[in-house]
């Protein structure tokens, strides 16, 4: 890409696209609404905590790179919107796929179809694959297919607005997420085991008292 985006710029741009497609009645966005969109916990990976100054700096860069526009002057509240349709002539399906990749990182075809449904209704997986192929064939390419990870059946795709992917970093992130999920599962099982032990102890006490009543 001629204008590579950093993580904050990518989150801001993805949030603008998402709100354009999901809540057009509230779009373009004020700065406050955009900050909230960037920091929301649903449909985000990772969840961020950006402040207004960070979002403003990202907006300035996106405007300079012609990825975003601002409207409102003369005392009116400034509103921000993305300029991807004007710049790249994206279809709604392409916008939905790119938005998901910007907001959640690399994903499989199935994940993109399921998660992208809120922005564009895909007829089937082949439509998603077709959109990904079109984006990959652009000059320069806008998405890339990642090598299949060990133990996984489906490859994932990533966006290239933030540059070529660092495969070693992506692998480390996936391992960390897997370890975190395993840790949460172990903690949950330990909690359930502790609760079961308490229930068994309580039941034994009840049985002992019941037997005493017949002695």
Swiss-Prot record:
Q: What SUPFAM superfamilies does its record include? A: Winged helix' DNA-binding domain
Q: Any coiled-coil ranges, and where?
A: none
Listed Pfam families? DUF480
Superkingdom as given in the UniProt entry? Bacteria
Q: Which family does it belong to?
A: Belongs to the UPF0502 family.
Protein name as it appears in the record:
UPF0502 protein Gbem_0102
């Amino acid at each position: 890409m001629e204008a590579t985006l950093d993580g904050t710029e990518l989150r801001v741009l993805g949030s603008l696209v998402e709100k354009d497609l999901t809540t057009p009645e509230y779009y373009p966005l004020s700065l406050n609404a955009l900050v909230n969109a960037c920091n929301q916990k649903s449909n985000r990976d990772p969840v961020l905590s950006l402040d207004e100054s960070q979002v403003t700096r990202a907006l300035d860069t996106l405007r300079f790179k012609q990825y975003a526009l601002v409207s409102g002057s003369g005392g009116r509240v400034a509103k921000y919107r993305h300029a991807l349709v004007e710049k790249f002539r994206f279809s709604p399906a392409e916008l939905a796929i790119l938005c998901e990749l910007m907001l959640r990182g690399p994903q499989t075809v199935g994940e993109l179809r399921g998660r992208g449904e809120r922005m564009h209704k895909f007829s089937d997986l082949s439509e998603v694959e077709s959109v990904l192929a079109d984006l990959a064939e652009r000059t320069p390419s806008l998405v890339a297919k990642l090598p299949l990870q060990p133990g996984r059946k489906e490859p994932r795709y990533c966006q290239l607005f933030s540059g070529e992917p660092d495969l070693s970093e992506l692998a480390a992130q996936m391992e960390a997420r897997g370890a975190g999920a395993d840790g949460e599962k172990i903690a949950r099982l330990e909690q359930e085991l502790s609760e079961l032990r308490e229930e068994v102890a309580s039941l034994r006490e009840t049985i002992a008292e019941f037997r005493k009543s017949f002695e």
